[in-house]
A protein has these predicted regions:
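Short, flexible helix-coil linker/hinge segments at the edges of structured domains or between repeats
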Residues: 23, 107-133
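Active-site beta->alpha N-cap acidic-glycine motif
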Residues: 1-97, 142-146, 152-159, 269
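A cross-domain feature marking catalytic cores of carbohydrate-active enzymes
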Residues: 10-12, 60-64, 103-107, 158-161, ...
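C-terminal domain-boundary segment and adjacent tail
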Residues: 179-205, 253-257, 262-336
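Secondary-structure boundary elements
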Residues: 53-54, 133-155, 177-186, 297
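A short, flexible beta-alpha/helix-coil linker loop
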Residues: 15-16, 67-68, 108, 274-277
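Acidic-and-aromatic substrate-binding clefts and catalytic sites of carbohydrate-active enzymes
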Residues: 35-42, 64-86, 113, 132-137, ...
Length: 336
């Protein structure tokens, strides 16, 4: 029996900088602690230990100009460049190729004037909502150029918040051109849509075809249940198990992974770097490992960890099986 792909989507990573702390509505966790503004590299190393041990694959963002604090090539405000380089080297050598690397546009904060590098008044997603391909193409191009200079091989992009949703046709046309101009790739993917509980299950779909180029939409199908670790100091085993239960219960019979699997969905499991880092405690990384253990125990004969690049290749190789855009395009209530 052909196994179902399972992929871990990790939004918002950047060298040390917490882009979430920069754009959060409040500078405090729900239990009143200050949100930390940087995540030490040790948390990345712990994450790598887990994904290597359990064979986890998926998508991992690298925000090129995180929180409008500079860029990952020329330096980030208040961050030691040696630590930035250490972070980038770790991602290049330990996160890839299991995870497909993507920009999450330029800053995941304020839109950027690409001529000056300075922040514009509007948040990136708000700015993008009124743009077309003539302005989106150079914007996406700049994000790809920075990651290419950082020696990342990129085949797709991630939308910060719902970047491009209101002008999706223009957005994906811009992405296709930018990807071809920077990397020479005719096929690429993007992550924008969050869909869950859709009858028949959700799979990637062909979103754009023109000039022998193709763009694939890869949706997410779960909430980010690791998020609650940001707002708690609990690190005990009972709490870890509770968080993991949302994805897959200890007996392998419940949780959103099981629910979506029974529907027939590709299992694209959503989380954020800040959720795994848990305001510095790394509780989310421990919960992720518990989820991975349960997947191994109960689903190893039904699912296989898959990178987004592999999902792209599968979709392109059998386009006719992936042309149907889901009828239900409901947006789930998820925190970014």
């Amino acid at each position: 029996m052909k196994k179902i792909p399972i992929s871990l989507i990790i939004d918002d990573p950047a060298p040390l900088v917490s882009v979430y702390a920069a754009h959060a509505d409040t500078p405090f966790t729900k239990d009143g602690r200050p949100l930390i503004e940087t995540f030490p590299n040790d948390l990345l190393f712990r994450f790598c230990d887990v994904i290597e041990k359990h064979g986890i694959k998926g998508k991992f963002s690298v925000v090129p100009m995180p929180a409008n604090k500079g860029d990952i090539i020329n330096g980030l405000e208040g961050i030691d460049q040696q630590q930035v380089d250490e972070w980038l080297d770790c991602v290049r050598t330990r996160v890839t190729p299991a995870f497909s690397i993507c920009p999450e546009m330029l800053s995941h904060n304020k839109a950027v004037d690409i001529e000056t590098g300075k922040a514009l008044p509007l948040r990136e997603d708000v700015w993008a909502s009124t743009q077309d391909r003539t302005t989106l193409t150079p914007y996406i191009t700049r994000a790809l150029e920075i990651l290419k200079e950082a020696k990342f091989d990129v085949h797709g992009v991630i939308s910060p918040w719902y970047f491009g949703k209101e002008v999706e046709e223009e957005y994906i046309a811009a992405l296709s051109k930018a990807m071809y101009d920077v990397y020479g790739y005719k096929n690429c993917f993007y992550f924008l849509h969050q869909l869950r509980g859709v009858p028949g299950g959700v799979k990637p779909w062909i979103a754009y075809e023109e000039d022998d180029r193709c763009v694939v939409s890869i949706p997410g199908v779960t909430r980010d249940w690791f998020w609650e670790t940001i707002d708690s100091t609990r690190t005990d085993d009972e709490f870890i198990s509770h968080v993991a239960d949302h994805y897959i219960t200890a007996d392998g019979k419940g949780g959103c992974i099981i629910h979506e699997l029974e529907l027939g969905a590709n299992l694209t499991v959503c989380t954020h770097w800040q959720s795994l880092c848990s305001n510095g405690l790394g509780t989310g990384i421990r919960a992720l490992e518990e989820v991975a253990k349960r997947v191994e125990k109960h689903l190893s004969d039904r699912v296989e960890w898959t990178s987004f690049n592999e999902l792209l290749e599968t979709t392109i190789n059998d386009k006719n099986a992936y042309r149907a855009r889901p009828v239900s395009m409901q947006k789930i209530d998820i925190e970014f």
